[in-house]
Amino acid sequence: MDKKAIELIKEALIEDGVDNDITTLNLVSKDKMLTGSFIVKATGVVSGIDVAKEVFKQINPRIKMEILKANGTFVNRGDVIATIEGPMRDILRGERVALNFLQRMSGIAATTAKFVQELAGTNCKILDTRKTAPLLRVFERQAVRD
């Protein structure tokens, strides 16, 4: 993952206020551990799984996230794309940021895949351009390529 992406993830965590999650900090013991799974809700294409992993790494390097489906993989509802294990408090603090990246990027990848399929057999080609959401270009362009 390039430096720009790592810095943008750091900024996203700051913006989300992960260090000020008073609900989690007050209700979840710092010793409580959690094991969980990322389960697909709709047929699509995985994108951003590496970004989600980096989110948790930045919060706590002790969080273990095993990627079961790589970026660019077609998935169906109910598929498990990753598992996660670590301090519950830290996983909950990063959950929203990780899922936001994962959902946005997977949505872009799935939509791109549909257009690529529609254009199969023609001379047309899907390109990723500079027309992206502010500050998200590095992630959105990756999603198109996935």
Q: Model-flagged regions — what are they?
A:
Residues 2-146:
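Acidic/glycine-rich phosphate/pyrophosphate-binding loops and surrounding catalytic core
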